[in-house]
Amino acid sequence: MQNLFLVFARNEVTDMQHCDKEFARESRRYLHQHPELSGQEYNTANFIREKLREFGIAYQNVGETGTFAWIKGRQDNGRKILLRADIDALPIAEQTNLSYKSVNPGVMHACGHDIHAAALLAAAKKLAEVQASFSGTVLLAFQQAEEFGHGAQYFQEQGLLTGYDRAFGVHIAPDVPVGTIVLSRKADAASCDFFRITLTGRKAHTSKPHLGRDALQAGAVLVGEIAKLPSRLLPASE
């Protein structure tokens, strides 16, 4: 048991497996129904903070819509772990018949952050209930603006990304059976980067195309050439 960064009584470790599923379900459905884009998660942040206050959990605001909370156990053994969830949604119109589908036109929790936030709230609720049964401190990060890639910066600027022993973050996967946790020694997910290419042409009379530069044709060729790059730059095994 001493290998755990938080030290629980043995029966409480088992009890931690039984979080309030109904609370988690209701929270997830509320968040799914009220999605907000990166940096605009005001209602989401208010919902999270209201629940933390109900549970008696101390927290501080991070930026306008991020939230950082902490739960101290019965004894401060100097050990800290960080649990993190993202909270923002995507600019996608939801086309489902769910009873709790998005009420915000053009915005949807299509990446599962509603589940992440609800799960962390459920964990926070349970940890608050067994607070007297563990030693150490649990830190909770409800991170805004993950989709735009700058949400963590607010936590960094406030010095909240140091001083803990381990950090845990999860992401749901619809192709993984319910109740299964997947761990990987290597990267298990990916993100995308954006870049812009500008092709500048030069006009010419149709009778003298050789005096011009056809940006459209160059663009068509470029698309095909870019598609070849991975096979030429990366090993086949990757």
What are these regions (language model features)?
Residues 90, 97-108, 115, 132-238:
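Histidine/acidic-residue-rich, glycine-tolerant segments that coordinate divalent metal ions
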Residues 8, 12-109, 114, 118-134:
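Acidic/His- and Gly-rich active-site-bordering loop/insert found
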